[in-house]
């Protein structure tokens, strides 16, 4: 409707393909995540390395369209020299190393907490990949301030996840549905 075509690249993990996406996207590509112990034997965050797939970069190289990297976990190819001349937009979901540190503090189980602590350290070291983005979009003003300090030479904009909250624009009444935004299997979202 807006004259924009979307090519969506997504990773399969704990859920099936979504045919609904094909009705709003020009193309939808699915990739399998590399999960398990082997995918964890790296200096990169597990949640980044597990999304490494040569077919993804091959598909990205088929055109010269802008690329939106949704979350730091999706940035494996952000610094790939073959994408040097592409418009790259990084939309952060949260400050990942802070998120994983909080998971480690609130989690149950020694191995699980150790994983979260290691992943926090990996993400803190890895966040420098955002310097390869032409634009960084922050989801909160606090995150925008943090990112401006970390990347003073980058263009950083604040675009909130939700509608403005100083007025209600929803129609009064009840509905059969309610929207929860968050992964409920994560301890912080329970």
Locate the predicted segments by residue:
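Short N-terminal targeting/anchoring amphipathic segment
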Residues: 58-76, 87-89
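Membrane-proximal helix-turn-helix segments that form the acceptor-binding/catalytic region
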Residues: 57-61, 96, 111-136
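N-terminal strand-loop element at the rim of the active site
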Residues: 5-44
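Conserved catalytic-core segment of nucleotide-activated headgroup transferases in glycan assembly
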Residues: 158-190
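Active-site proximal beta-strand in glycosyltransferases
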Residues: 67, 83-106
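Helix-loop-beta element that forms the nucleotide-linked donor phosphate-binding surface
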Residues: 82-85, 128-163
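A short, charged, and often flexible helix/loop element on the N-terminal side
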Residues: 28-56, 108-115
């Amino acid at each position: 409707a807006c004259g924009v075509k979307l090519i969506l690249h997504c990773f399969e993990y704990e859920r099936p393909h979504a045919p609904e996406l094909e009705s709003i996207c020009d193309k939808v590509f699915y990739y399998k995540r590399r999960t398990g112990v082997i995918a964890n034997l790296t200096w990169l965050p597990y949640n980044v390395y597990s999304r490494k797939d040569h077919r993804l970069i091959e598909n990205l190289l088929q055109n010269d369209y802008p690329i939106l990297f949704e979350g730091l976990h999706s940035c494996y190819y952000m610094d790939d020299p073959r994408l040097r001349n592409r418009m790259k937009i990084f939309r952060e979901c949260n400050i990942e190393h802070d998120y994983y540190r909080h998971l480690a503090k609130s989690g149950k189980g020694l191995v699980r907490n150790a994983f979260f602590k290691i992943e926090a350290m990996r993400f803190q070291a890895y966040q420098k990949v955002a310097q390869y983005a032409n634009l960084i979009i922050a989801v909160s003003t606090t995150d925008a301030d943090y990112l401006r300090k970390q990347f003073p030479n980058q263009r950083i904009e604040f675009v909130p996840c939700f509608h403005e909250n100083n007025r209600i624009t929803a129609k009064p009444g009840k509905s059969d549905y309610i929207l929860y935004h968050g992964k409920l299997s994560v301890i912080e979202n329970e």
